[in-house]
């Protein structure tokens, strides 16, 4: 990824565990040293855990909540001083949280329930709105994107078993393409998105509003 992005300009990479306070501090220090400030924060780290209700472990549930929700709160809180320094009324700093359509509706993948994932994303959407109100006075906007199904390591299992059902459930009858996420992130990060604040934007081909959703079978 670093090599690919470096084709467009200078780029740095740093591995960090955002659930760890020391790693978060190291990450923000790295950003400040390399860039001198921070104007865009994208909270994109995520985890999932699928299991039947009777077999769903407490530590698995906690891991997902900690990664998808608590770490977003903590990193955002810690990054606010840097974001504030870069922000102006005309060109606010941006926080973009990656939520999920599973935080909008109750998912129906009955064979692989993901209780913690959908709960964490619903909470993240509301945290986005809370942050938007709290940080507006500091000229920081906060929005969330709620993707539908895109190809990724996290979706490998469901694509292998249920891709046709996924496509049938989507009014556009297909899964998302990478450039369709790139476009909405670019909008929110650009001057065109400077007046957008506190929104949760679905990018799911209409799946979250489809009336024909049904349980999937093998």
For the regions a protein language model found, what residue spans apply to each?
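Short-chain dehydrogenase/reductase
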Residues: 1-35, 48-49, 59-60
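Substrate-binding pocket helix/loop in short-chain dehydrogenase/reductase
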Residues: 52-53, 57-65, 166
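Alpha-helical segment proximal to the catalytic Tyr-Lys
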Residues: 81, 133-134, 194
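Catalytic loop of short-chain dehydrogenase/reductase
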Residues: 87-123, 128-137
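Short, small/polar-rich loop/turn modules that mediate ligand/substrate recognition or access, typified
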Residues: 136, 141, 196-198
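A conserved structural motif in NAD(P)-dependent oxidoreductases
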Residues: 170-181
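Short C-terminal tail/terminal secondary-structure segment
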Residues: 186, 197-218
